[in-house]
Amino acid sequence: MNYNIAVMSGDGIGPEIITEAKKVLDKVGSNYGHKFNYTEVLMGGVSIDATGEPLTKEALEIAKGSDSVLLGAVGGDVGKSNWYSLPPHLRPEAGLLAIRKGLNLFANIRPAILFDELKGACPLKEEIVGSGFDFVVMRELTGGLYFGERSTVEENGVRKATDTLVYDENEVRRIAKWAFEIAMKRGKKVCSVDKANVLDSSRLWRQVTKEVSKDYPEVELSDMLVDNCAMQLVKNPKQFDVILTENMFGDILSDEASMITGSIGMLASASLGDTKLGLYEPSHGSAPDIAGQNKANPIATILSAAMMLRYSFDLEVEADKIEAAVKAVLKKGYRTIDIMSEGMTLVGTKEMGDLIISEI
């Protein structure tokens, strides 16, 4: 099979980590009879330098015409880069918002995996994490409080601010379907997180999620209030498989989940919509302070590529192979500087990529 991938290397360490992900994909393609065709597209600061825009219409059209999009990282040093003297809509990160909107991506998936080999980097006690954990946070991206009507006014000399939280049942239904589909490929458990004891929007969320669950009888659905979920993530993270939640709750919980894994350099991310076309990227930033020094950890980007194979291309075996290769390299004691510990072997970006390829 041939697959067309729009590659947005972006800024900082983006080109380095994307190079390693492409090498891994090419190895998988060679082993399993696939051909991955890459079209390089400018995004973020490099696009601003070349075109004056963080994402051009032409770049967006290329992305729309591809089977998937693989992104490195966007942005620079806020205190030093001229990009941040520009209006907000012309800054690097605006390109990311633009492509999510342009591709109608409404679901963000962030896996939170603690590999057994990296337990020492986890801030939680060993008796809590055991042999590690593996769950995903699925966050709705385009509705809720962040996109509702807002205002700030002064009434009788008193300042007053209002934000509006709105969801309709179609918005809830489409992301709930994604959560159940992903659970079918994992542990077949969905935990829907809300604040249904207080919020009408959460009560609707809970109702619609239960309706969708009827189409997935193999998947176990549970409901959890968001404050309890925040506690359970640090008390017993192993209980979770797929956490489904709305925009603001997901924003907070996914960051909490990322911290208990020990290193953000290990965390992949996917943004999905109604079609198989998705945006795959590491959760970390562009790290301009180490750009070009062969120090960046490419694993999050490589794992993002594995997610692309699984969710956009339905190549489950190939995705599993990449993830197993990452685990094998970690088990042998190889580490980039961000996850380095005593007794391990320090390697650079390129070397880590080569080691993972050798295990495929």
What is each residue range found by the language model?
Residues 1-5:
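Extreme N-terminal starter segment of soluble prokaryotic enzymes
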Residues 6-23, 28-29, 155-227, 239:
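Glycine-rich phosphate/diphosphate-binding loop of Rossmann-like nucleotide-binding domains
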Residues 26, 30-34, 65-68, 101-108, ...:
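Generic secondary-structure signature for well-ordered alpha-helical cores
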Residues 142-143, 147-186, 190-191, 196-198, ...:
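Glycine-rich phosphate/pyrophosphate-binding loop and the adjoining helix
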Residues 45-48, 90, 234-334:
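Glycine-rich phosphate/nucleotide-binding loop
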Residues 11-14, 67, 138, 179, ...:
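Buried hydrophobic positions in well-ordered alpha/beta secondary-structure cores of metabolic enzymes
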Residues 33-57, 231-233:
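N-terminal beta-loop-helix "entrance" segment that forms/cooperates
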Residues 49-162, 248:
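N-terminal glycine-rich phosphate/adenylate-binding segment common to multiple enzyme folds
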